[in-house]
């Protein structure tokens, strides 16, 4: 009985007594220069329970994503500065590609003095008044100094612009001297014309693979000083015969200029007439419509732009603004130089 009462008393005293505080254990110290890694890192919960992580049922603020930037005209995003795209030489700012400039070049023309020039549009065949079956060669030319013109039938040309007649026995070359002057008229002497009916069509109409031209005219300017014989200026005009509606006509296929022992081929430039005739009509650049045109597009030979627009065109397109053919070269021509 006494033991039972003592046990009850002891239990009651334990209930009234305070619970002793838990023993504080020192934190586990890791040795220096030691690292602890998880053998298998746990996977993160894609749908975490924010109630357990934040006491008091206080949810974190919603995660805000960066706003989408507007589209540009190329329908490409403007990425932030720290984007994942790497710079590239063909990309502007790492966002969209740009085309490299065209490969054609922009050059300035070099002035070459031509002392004698045959106007090829005036070259024609006229009937001989004394011999209707024969035709005479006629043309107009300009000369800044005296010289000599040679008309050769069925001629061949060497590398130094020398003509040789292949039918010299029946059609000898015709040579005459001229003086200085513009707009001079040449007409072959009567009785020395050519009878085209005496030749076959294979001889009159030049084949592609032959070097013989049915007609060639050599205009040579001779300086007055004897010591300047090495600076002779020569122009060769190569002519072929064509037949239209039964009538035989002549057509200039090429003009060669020989200056200082160098060979040049003369080509027409379309649009240059409007820039040198003194008229203000039609001489403006076709791009800006304000500056005078001074640049020619090759190989189509359209003189249609000013030098400023031609330089800007190199970085935009490689097509001629007139005929839309591909551009290989831009040639700037200074009319005052």
UniProtKB/Swiss-Prot annotation:
It comes from the Eukaryota. It holds the Pfam family zf-C3HC4_3. Myristoylated (in vitro). A zinc finger (RING-type) spans 285-324. GO terms for biological process: protein ubiquitination. Its EC number is 2.3.2.27. Gene3D superfamilies: Zinc/RING finger domain, C3HC4 (zinc finger). One of its GO terms (molecular function) is zinc ion binding. Residues 139-255 are annotated as: DAR2 domain. InterPro entries: LOG2-like_mRING_C3HC5 (IPR045195), MGRN1/RNF157-like (IPR045194), Znf_RING (IPR001841), Znf_RING/FYVE/PHD (IPR013083). Acts as an E3 ubiquitin-protein ligase, or as part of E3 complex, which accepts ubiquitin from specific E2 ubiquitin-conjugating enzymes and then transfers it to substrates (in vitro). Belongs to the RING-type zinc finger family. LOG2 subfamily. This is Probable E3 ubiquitin-protein ligase LUL1. It comes from Arabidopsis thaliana (Mouse-ear cress).
